């Protein structure tokens, strides 16, 4: 079983964590290709391409300039500790013990516009490149064409040892679209998190993102191998609702914190 996550825009390279092992990303050559494209763009071009403020555009141009194919403790940080958005606040990797991080390394994959796929302990240099960015590149007009079936091939290989391969999709559609399902050949289970608002249950982005991280943490802490066990997820007031779910789309609802 693999759990898929989206990356985060917000990054934390200030907090240092000693004694955490690291690995290297799988697609450094491809990342280098993309960085070479990005390095030729001005802050104004990056601002327009990514719809960023002038300050954020300048920051990311500086990141592209500083990016190197050689990763080190000086320029990199483990992905699961570097990402700092809503999903990763829910996951709270900083409080996980080494054994949990080791399990996550083999069962969690973070999809990335620049790195393709990151394992939790893969070193990552800071960047901003969302998967939906229409970046013209040597392989096509966007990142979906650039990555092609590479991401799916990697995930397929990771699942090869499983008799009944299952992917738990906790990523956004923007990122999951980068996975070629014809190549992956696995059962895909989508987890949907809904909150009660305005008289009905609906997906509220902030809460749903955080819940994806909470679900990943739940699986990591319990080292879940059987996907069905995820239906027991009961963190932060969420609960599985069979009547709103089907075989491959599992709905978890929260009426208010602590109440289904």
Regions picked out by a protein language model, each given a short descriptive name:
Residues 4-95:
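Active-site helix-to-loop segments that bind/position phosphate- or nucleotide-bearing substrates
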Residues 93-260:
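Internal, well-folded beta-alpha domain core
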